[in-house]
């Protein structure tokens, strides 16, 4: 019986050490000069070549004009968005549930058009909540 306990204790210690060892970060091996040279040459070959092209004056002027056109079109689009009036909210349905009140599924819809019935805890507690305040 005493030998069995000693064997089980040894097995338990070995399992603990094995588990701890498996969770350790692997150590990096020191690299010598040959490994560094071969890795750097491989990395240089893997990169795609990049060609640098100088722009002439005409292409610079065209790109500036295009940029100005884009800026003016963005300004016009933003002015149109500001000028448009917001659409009116639809009137609430006659029998409705106020915001933050209980709205279990047989209950009518929420009064606020931006609110929705949100249920929690397996639909045991439901309430009307506004999810998007900028509706």
From Swiss-Prot:
Q: Name the Gene3D superfamilies for this protein.
A: Agouti domain
Q: Which residues are glycosylated?
A: 39
List localization entries. Answer: Secreted
What are the annotated disulfide bridges? 96-111, 103-117, 110-128, 114-135, 119-126
Q: Where is this region: Disordered?
A: 56-101
Q: Where is the Agouti domain?
A: 96-135
- GO annotation terms (biological process): hormone-mediated signaling pathway; melanin biosynthetic process; melanosome organization
Primary location class? secreted
Q: Care to name a GO molecular-function term for this sequence?
A: melanocortin receptor binding
Does the record bear RNA-binding in its keywords?
no
InterPro entries per record: Agouti, Agouti_dom, Agouti_dom_sf
Q: Which residues form the signal peptide?
A: 1-22
Record SMART domains: Agouti
Alphabetically ordered keywords of this record:
Disulfide bond, Glycoprotein, Knottin, Secreted, Signal
Q: Which GO terms describe its cellular component?
A: extracellular space
Q: What is known of its domains?
A: The presence of a 'disulfide through disulfide knot' structurally defines this protein as a knottin.
Functional summary from the UniProt entry? Involved in the regulation of melanogenesis. The binding of ASP to MC1R precludes alpha-MSH initiated signaling and thus blocks production of cAMP, leading to a down-regulation of eumelanogenesis (brown/black pigment) and thus increasing synthesis of pheomelanin (yellow/red pigment).
In Swiss-Prot or TrEMBL terms, this protein is called: Agouti-signaling protein
Q: Which source organism does the UniProt entry give?
A: Felis catus (Cat)
Q: Which gene encodes it?
A: ASIP
């Amino acid at each position: 019986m005493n030998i069995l306990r000693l064997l089980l204790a040894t097995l338990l210690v070995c399992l603990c050490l094995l588990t701890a060892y498996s969770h350790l970060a692997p150590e990096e091996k020191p690299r010598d000069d040959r490994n560094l040279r071969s890795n750097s040459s491989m990395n240089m070959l893997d990169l795609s070549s990049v060609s640098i092209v100088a722009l002439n004056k005409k292409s610079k002027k065209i790109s500036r004009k295009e940029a100005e056109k884009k800026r003016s079109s963005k300004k016009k689009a933003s002015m149109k968005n500001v000028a448009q009036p917001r659409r009116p909210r639809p009137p609430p349905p006659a029998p409705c549930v106020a915001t933050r009140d209980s709205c279990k599924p047989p209950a009518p819809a929420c009064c606020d058009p931006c609110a929705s019935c949100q249920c929690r805890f397996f639909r045991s507690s439901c309430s009307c909540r506004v999810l998007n305040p900028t509706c």
